[in-house]
Amino acid sequence: MAFKTTSVATTTSASTKPTVDFDALNDFVVEQVGCQQPETLNGVIVGIIDLGNQKLPDAEYDVDSGDEDLSVEELEAKYADEIEAGKISKFDFVKDWSTRPPKDVIKKFVPQKDRQCISYCVDFPDVMLDKGQFFGENSEPKPLRLYFGGQYYHQGLKKMIVQNLLPLKLSNIAKDPRNDKLWSLNPKSQLHKMAVASKIINTGEAFLPDQIDELLGKTLQFKVQIGFNEKGDKKYYFEKMSFLGAIQRKDKPFENVDVFLIQMDDENDPEALKQIRKHLLNTMEMATNFEGSALQKQLLEVRPQSFGGTSSSAVVKKETPKAVVEPVASDSNEDDDDWS
């Protein structure tokens, strides 16, 4: 997909923002969308956001064959050298929900390398919302926009961050992996499934991380739910979205949509940067390659208020973006689809 190249002059300042009644805004969205129960909607991928190289949680595995009857202490003693070398993080109990009743089982936890991760956002043009009234802006209905990955409050950081990251991990998908190499995002990964559903590739073909921008503008089916979780006398707004598959034959793809690609080390569209939600910015800040990146510099110019700073006017030139990734080969731990 070709991106337009334009020059954009952007003036920003630490001006006072309008006070937003988020309770009223959330009530409005829930009522207007009408998806308190999960519903299938056609949506178009309009944005891909590079979250940088993120530290991932330990991978969880079954204990090795022959170790099933050992206790945690016995496993720690047997693999003391591997634990000291950092090849194994720990052995610990986890709840096995596949049994009835659920039972505690011992799992092996192994460190994962930092990996480049992304998120993406989807517009649903069949659901138009006019949020201007809540932000002191002119009336301008826009499609419902949802971001993959959900969000949660990180107690240590004291801020909201992305809950489910999409790591760009490669697997050897050759039919004879011992003798041949065919590197690709894992066929079980969400991004590979999207590529097949949107007919970018056929089943069994490779889909590489530097191809993910080809998903921009593609119309697919998603499961959507927007509502409130009630706890005591309080209610908490939530948005859920997960990829389902290709659209039905009778449906037409959405056309003439504006798309954007945000990357860590490229010039990005200032207008797109202004629209990124705060939990995505918070997650970008956690990336090991965020400090000193081109993206950090641009965000400090375009959105200084999001980082506690100020900025004078800045002129940013948009260039044609290309998906630039640093994939790490892996034969395991594919990212599964999350109902996030």
Can you say where each PLM-predicted feature lies in the sequence?
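Short beta-rich binding modules
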Residues: 2-340
